[in-house]
Amino acid sequence: MNRTFALFISLFLSMTLYSQIHEVGIFLGGSNYIGDVGPTTYITPSEPAFGILYKWNKSPRHAYRFSYTQSKITSNDLDSKEPSRSQRGYRFENSIKEVSLGLEFNFFDFDLHQLERKITPYVYSGISYFRYDELYVVSGETRTEERANSFAIPMIVGIKSNITPSLILALEVGTRYSITDNLDGSNPKSERLKPLQFGNINNNDWYVFSGLTLTYTFGKKPCYCAE
């Protein structure tokens, strides 16, 4: 993913030429998966996740956001309350490396040049592109066929506040609806592996990143006016 970091640096340098305020920071949290293997709990961070992010604030209500996040996702049928899954006993492990670009919207004005303490809920969506392992299951054992790429639709909700004049702390939960049904090995793409399909092949898999972001703000005071 060296090209991802090069893209991040290029975007960062180009945006600093403008007068809007910027944010750059880190994400720390956990990940979980929702699909055809293991429990169906929606928010159960079970593996560490980390990332970097950049925001270009165009107004007190909205910002363009770019991020890179990576994590491992795992699940085990033995942790499921569904008898059919717990008896089956499948488990898997996959690696997710994601870049995402989209729009973040604040429910309340969040003018970073006003020094008083501010707090606001926010939502984010856009498009994500990620790398993962194409898996398949044979004789109860999960194997890797190849490294693959896919898209996902991120849907993030969170709440944030400025803890100092230059630092913003946020808590967020972000689900990703992936355009693949094979994060878990249940629906391999290869024709020769189609007989190994299991589960509901009409529903795609989801993965979730939950955690904290800490961003540093900088840039000239903007004019929030119609362009």
Each language-model region and where it sits:
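Bacterial Sec-dependent N-terminal signal peptides
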Residues: 1-27, 218, 227
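Short glycine/proline- and aromatic-enriched beta-strand/turn motifs that initiate or cap beta-hairpins
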Residues: 19-57, 134, 209-222
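Outer-envelope beta-barrel architecture signal
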Residues: 20-24, 60-64, 97, 115-121, ...
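Extracellular loop and loop/strand-boundary signature of outer-membrane beta-barrel proteins
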Residues: 34-40, 84-92, 140-145, 197-200
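Residues that define the transmembrane beta-barrel architecture of outer-membrane proteins
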Residues: 44-48, 95-99, 119, 145-153, ...
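Gram-negative (and chloroplast) outer-membrane scaffold detector with strong preference
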Residues: 60-62, 66-137, 216-218
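Predominantly the C-terminal beta-signal and adjacent terminal strand-loop region
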Residues: 78, 163-227
